[in-house]
Amino acid sequence: MQLTSFTDYGLRALIYMASLPEGRMTSISEVTDVYGVSRNHMVKIINQLSRAGYVTAVRGKNGGIRLGKPASAIRIGDVVRELEPLSLVNCSSEFCHITPACRLKQALSKAVQSFLTELDNYTLADLVEENQPLYKLLLVE
């Protein structure tokens, strides 16, 4: 299964925020500079992450964005469920003649659930804590 760029960059934004020293805020511009993503795309991602409670946005002169929960409380599987459209096949099409007997959707659904269950074993903290090579690449030591 390949994640959409929306989910990919959502996870990367969370990784960046989790890599920062505790309490440090960042900005959407800073995140887009680190990953070379369009600002408009990142604004949409951060808005969805904010609505889901993964990111807190603070307005004003000293505002910015930061994690909305501790990194140890953010399960990667939950983030993927929030950001990723998980329907792998469109079985509602009237043009598919095998829909009444097809078992593909069920098989793919089970595969997606296995994928998400495995991702549920990891938190954001698992990906960033004590990861010096990551900090060097993100320049956040």
UniProtKB/Swiss-Prot annotation:
The keyword tRNA-binding does not apply. [2Fe-2S] cluster binds at residues 91, 96, 102. GO terms for biological process: negative regulation of DNA-templated transcription; regulation of DNA-templated transcription. Pfam families: Rrf2. Keywords: 2Fe-2S, DNA-binding, Iron, Iron-sulfur, Metal-binding, Repressor, Transcription, Transcription regulation. InterPro entries: TR_Rrf2-type_CS, Tscrpt_reg_Rrf2, Tscrpt_rep_HTH_NsrR, WH-like_DNA-bd_sf, WH_DNA-bd_sf. Binds 1 [2Fe-2S] cluster per subunit. GO terms for molecular function: 2 iron, 2 sulfur cluster binding; DNA-binding transcription factor activity; double-stranded DNA binding; iron ion binding. Its cofactor is [2Fe-2S] cluster. SUPFAM superfamilies: Winged helix' DNA-binding domain. This is HTH-type transcriptional repressor NsrR. It comes from Escherichia coli (strain K12).
